[in-house]
Amino acid sequence: MNPIILIHGGAWDIPDSLVEAHVQGVTKAAICGMRGLNHSAVNAVEAAVSSMEDDPAFDAGTGSFLNKDGKVELDAVIIEGTSMVAGAVGAVHRIKNPIKLARKVMENCDTIFLVGTGAEQFAAEQGIKLCDNENLIIERERERWKILSREKKPAKEFFQRGTVGAVALDTKGGLVAGTSTGGTPFKQPGRIGDSPILGAGTYATHECAVSCTGWGEAIMKAVMARTVADLVEKGESAQDAAEKSVDILKKRFLGYGGCIVVTKDGDYGIAYNTPRMARAVYTAQMSDPVAAV
């Protein structure tokens, strides 16, 4: 089995001035993920997503959008397709890398989804250091929040930066998907988007692994990640499945976004209906990852 990792850094109207930062970010994530693939697809996805959580170019981890209360509030999920084990966290304020906590939930908890203070308590029990929310806030987002507080609603120009995700196939045929997000700008505190919802923003089976990005409420209605997986299981190529799912998102649910998918055979697909989507592909046969927006 030839290992492969796909990365996305969000589907939106990335301005020219931010293209280079996004290309660099997804490239670094792909490199981190490929190193992890030497061990397993789980390690690869965790490493890739963690890299983007640490990069303020993306709406995940440090530098995420602030909610109405002026706080960073994060969601993440990871799922292994063959065994269908998964872990998810939502609305956490004190976790630097929520994808790492999601993995702890997957491996060491008897439930799938933990939120808020309960998730943070579990993190402490698992040896994950809690951080101050202030440490996740950057000045750019503090200034954005001040403007949005005056406006009372997010203007179109503030829908910037995106959810991050990765899907991977390892040498043993393991398929894993992971997604992490800071959510929408000036969101209602406690809002959970599509990203950590299995079947909506993220999904994996023995056939494929999928991570989505875009406007969460529409993606949840479309059950987008599961739609991609169902199409693959019905015999569609990865690319066709991705494109058809994005088409459904737009036509039936008036939604915008994108997705990445990799199958058990190493076939992969990338599709989006926004002006741009940061993404990268890295296979064992490549000397370097291929990244684009």
Annotate each language-model stretch with its function:
Residues M1-V293:
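Alpha/propeptide regions of enzymes that mature by internal proteolysis
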